[in-house]
Amino acid sequence: MPDKLTPEQRHKCMSRIRGKDTKPELWVRKYLYAHGFRYRLHEKRLPGKPDIVIRRLRTVILVNGCFWHGHTEPPLPSPVEDGKGGVRCKYYVTPHTRVDFWQKKIERNKARDFEDRNALKLLGWNVIVIWECQVNQAEIREQTLQSLVRTLSQIELDIAKIKRPAVKKYDFEEKQPYSMVADENDNPSL
C-alpha cells in the first residue's frame, strides 16, 4: 500500500515525534512530584537511560510509547479488536507501508527493552513500566498513577524494614532488688 504522504511530509511528521518529555512522561512526573517523590531524568549511567530514576528507592520508571515499544496487550477498560479474534492496545498498529522494516524495528526495540530491564534488575534496581495507553486514557490515568504511588510506597516500606536496626531484647529477670529513690517512710511535701 503506497504512503499517502510525500517523503517530505512524512519526514516532517516523523521529525516531530519526541523521545523525551512526552505527554505521558510529563503526566507521570507531575503526579510523582505532587506526591512527594523526587527523581532524576534519563540517567546516562544506567542501562537504557531510564525515563525516571528514584535513587532513594533504587527504582526506575520506564514510560513506554505503545507504538515504539510494541505494546500488544490492551489496558483493561478499552481494548480494541485486532480483526483476528483477539484484542490489542489501540495505540499499536503495524504500519501498512514498509511492513518488514517496521516489524524488525519494533522487534529490535522490544529485545533492547528486555535486555535493559534485565540489566537494571541485575544491578539491584526495581523496574516499573508504564505504557502510554495507561496514562493517555483519562478513565484509567488516575487509577494507574495511584497504583504507581502505592507501589513506590510499598518499595519505600520494604527498604525501611531492611535498614531498620534489629530490636534489642532485654532480660528483665530480677537478680537483685532494685534500689528505691525515696524511702518509704519519707513523706515528701508537695
Which functions belong to the PLM regions below?
Residues M1-P79, G83-V129, C133-L190:
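Nucleic-acid endo/exonuclease domains
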